[in-house]
């Protein structure tokens, strides 16, 4: 993923409200949202090239998502696949707390990334690029609205701030059906003003192109928007909208399930 905004235990009906965009090169093969053949309890898209995923959930309510940390130097070809951080959790039996503890040692071996791992009890954020921490940063998150892109959690990049404000306003409006509104905030193609752009080591032109929540460019852009809603009673709705290289919507998928009691 390249943009994730979420409300954790901050809504009277939903324990989790999450909206995310996946940005990727268009020639990298991937599978759309579905249950996995090799792990039938896991629901998510999948990276065909490496076998991992950017965002997935288990029917027991555990979920995870990863974003790359933007750096001027591309990841080395031998780097461990960051998508396996997500698949390794949702295909396991570990709780969020257990996985966050266990991942702290190997996480620095991966290229720059951020990881969210959650279950019904807790939500953890992990990063291997926070210079204030030796090795990995592991943090248990408090209830509230958070945003994550290709830097650290809640870094005030324009698109993160914009989408967090939109999510907070949506939650405050008290609407019962919010999926379309979440997809609307993810569909924003407005770039940030030049004076607001972060300096991440890429060219000014690319920095501006990457600054909108929804990205359209030749060969690279937003390939999927995903919404996950988890009711307080355990009903989970995961929705995905897929896009082509021109930003035109290609498909929609919705999966609904009731969280099992196997773990939570």
What are these regions (language model features)?
Residues 1-264:
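N-terminal nucleophile
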